[in-house]
Amino acid sequence: MFYEDIQPQKLKDFLLDPTHDTLCDLLLHNTGETDFLDFKAKWIDLTKLAKHILAIANSGGGSIIVGVGQQADGSSSLDGLSNQDFLDKADVDNKLGNYLPSWVKYRTEDFIFDGQASAPFTDKKFQVLIIEYDPKYVPYTSIISRGELRYGAIYIRQGTKSIEASNEKLLEIILRKVKAGDAYSTDLTLIEHLTQLKHLYAERNRQADDDYERFIERVIERKQRRIEQVLDVYGMADE
């Protein structure tokens, strides 16, 4: 699933149907990095990559295209990946799993163009991380502190950067979640509900802004009621 307002449209077309043709169309009409799209010349440090994945997943889903460089004037360069830099996609996905919550949905796809492909894709190789958006689970938080990652941090995209969410950005995430629906889906397990509640408690304890703290308190109360419903104890009188 992806956020309905993903931009540019060529990216949305690619995400819904990730083929060689839609990738070419996206790259040939590239308008630069956005909240939903990132380019890398080569594979980068896994903690940095995990940070970008969390940010894109929280922002609505999207992709990271590996094999696209940047020229001195800021324009993109469709260099592709060398054989040495073209990694095993299963290995990439498995290693990333050590840095990401298990419910973040992502996958790596290979795009190999042969000598018959039109320029500038002739004999080029690209790899693309496709990152989905699931309103049941956002906001995704970092599960470890290592390298670029801080435990419990919520990352979002801001143009070409992946940064920690401000109070205002966190509110945007929640409003987008509500708009997409399923904010309190019964598909969540009890453990997932409890994990979300734990993160809400931690978020409340580290905030100094009164308005934001009151907002978190309201969300905590609703989450507590939802957990009581899952346990079938909602409305029971205390003894």
Model features per residue range: what roles?
Residues 1-63, 68-72, 165-239:
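Bergerat-fold GHKL/Histidine-kinase-like ATPase
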Residues 20-29, 92-96, 113-117, 142-143:
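Intrinsically disordered, low-complexity boundary segments flanking structured domains
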Residues 38-42, 75-82, 144-146:
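Short hinge/gating elements
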Residues 47-50, 86-89, 123:
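Amphipathic alpha-helical transducer elements in NTP-driven molecular machines
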Residues 48, 75, 137-140:
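Intrinsically disordered, low-complexity acidic/polar segments
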Residues 56-57, 98, 116-121:
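Short, charge-rich binding segments
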Residues 63-116:
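A broadly used, surface-exposed interaction patch
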Residues 103-196:
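Intrinsically disordered, low-complexity regulatory tails
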